């Protein structure tokens, strides 16, 4: 491969952030670096930006997904452990269902959004009557949320919303991450904004929030407000000895650090700029590539803040040629990250292969293109010219 000129992603933590972090670390008295007051400040600022009541920061988007599943399981509110999972997803959207003993049922990908196929989803809802559906807002492009919320009201399921790659996107003016009973985001390198590693779970449900706080930190009472803490001590008939070393849940240690929260707070200051530039880039890719390639579709009233742009080649062979041409020109790419989750060993070893037309097409034909805030219009035009010339040459 040629030297990478156009990486798939660039860090949103820039020189000014490094300098500010160095200055903060060396303040007198020296600041606490493990989880402390800055994490809470970061959680509150994110909740305010997103428009939700509560957020719990953790060490990764994958942990955020696991916490959502586990809080739901520990809540005692499930009528069964059946859950519909998406075929077009990252592995840690689906894996907690297996890890925690749910009964996952896979759903076909939608030809327009690459999210949940609405027709197949309703068939599965009718047949299995699951307690839960988890969805992914794939690469920042919203699912058909109007239809999904209608189905939620009709079939009374809990909705977990994975927006790990969709921070800043909107469906007809409403931010993604505000539809689910719980929603997850990832603040890993290359995502809309970064805390080095990290994630958050957001919710408007107080019971879920209290469970998330406990499950993130060993299952203990530390972090709960005094009234909730007192209620749990009374419920379990435990004397309050002024210690938080009382464990009400079998939890994890998924905590974020104040060091990461310091960076996150700075990142949120430029969130609107990050969203605006990624959205501009996504729309330009769409306009330039739509005549010749398959891609996600979305309503004109929606805002798309993607971490990559995904295009679909005609077939496997064309994708190979396009990837080779991109490599030769220093443009980093990859196949649609994992495509159809139902074709990976962790899934088919347990449940058999999930073969569905659209999910398989993503697996065979999808490829990613760079998107980051400093990518210019001329950069995108060059990238698109490489792809288009390669494809049209081989189609003639």
Protein language model annotation of sequence segments:
Residues 10-11, 40-44, 52-55, 61-62, ...:
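PLP-dependent aminotransferase class I/II
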Residues 25, 47, 97, 151-152, ...:
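A generic structural signal for well-ordered alpha-helical segments
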Residues 73-154, 158-163, 170:
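PLP-dependent aminotransferase-like
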Residues 56, 84, 105, 159-160, ...:
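Structural detector of well-ordered beta-strand residues that form the stable sheet scaffold
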Residues 129, 156, 180-181, 293:
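Residue-level detector of structured alpha->beta connecting loops
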């Amino acid at each position: 491969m040629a030297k990478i000129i156009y990486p798939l992603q660039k860090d949103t933590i820039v020189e000014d952030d490094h300098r500010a972090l160095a200055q903060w670390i060396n303040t007198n008295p020296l600041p606490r670096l493990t989880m402390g007051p800055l994490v809470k400040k970061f959680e509150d600022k994110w909740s305010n930006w997103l428009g939700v009541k509560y957020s719990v920061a953790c060490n990764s988007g994958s942990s955020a997904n696991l916490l959502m599943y586990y809080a739901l399981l520990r809540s005692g509110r499930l009528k069964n452990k059946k859950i519909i999972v998406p075929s077009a997803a990252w592995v840690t959207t689906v894996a907690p269902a297996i890890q925690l003993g749910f009964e996952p049922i896979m759903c076909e990908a939608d030809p327009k959004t690459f999210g949940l196929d609405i027709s197949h989803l309703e068939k599965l809802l009718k047949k299995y009557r699951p307690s839960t559906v988890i969805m992914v807002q794939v690469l920042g492009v919203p699912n058909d949320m109007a239809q999904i919320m209608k189905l939620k009201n009709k079939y009374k399921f809990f909705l977990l919303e994975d927006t790990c790659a969709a921070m800043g996107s909107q469906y007809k003016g409403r931010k993604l991450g505000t539809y689910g009973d719980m929603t997850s985001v990832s603040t890993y390198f290359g995502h809309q904004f970064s805390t080095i590693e990290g994630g958050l779970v957001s919710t408007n449900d107080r019971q879920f929030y209290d469970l998330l706080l406990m499950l993130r930190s060993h299952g203990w009472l530390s972090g709960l407000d005094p009234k909730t803490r007192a209620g749990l001590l009374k419920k379990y008939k435990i004397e309050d000895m002024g210690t938080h070393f009382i464990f009400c849940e079998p939890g994890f240690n998924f905590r974020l650090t104040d060091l990461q929260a310091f960076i996150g707070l700075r990142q949120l200051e430029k969130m609107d700029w990050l969203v605006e530039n990624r959205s501009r880039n996504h729309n330009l890719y769409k306009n330039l590539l739509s005549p010749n390639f398959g891609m996600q579709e979305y309503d004109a009233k929606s805002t798309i803040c993607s971490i990559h742009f995904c295009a679909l080649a005609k077939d496997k062979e064309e994708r190979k040629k396009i990837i080779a041409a991109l490599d030769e020109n220093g443009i980093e790419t990859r196949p649609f990250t994992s495509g159809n989750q139902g074709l990976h060993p962790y899934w088919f070893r347990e449940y058999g292969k999930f073969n569905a037309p659209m999910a398989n097409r993503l697996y065979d034909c999808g490829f990613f293109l760079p998107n980051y805030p400093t990518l210019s219009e001329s950069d995108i035009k060059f990238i698109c010219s490489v792809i288009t010339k390669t494809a049209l040459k081989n189609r003639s």
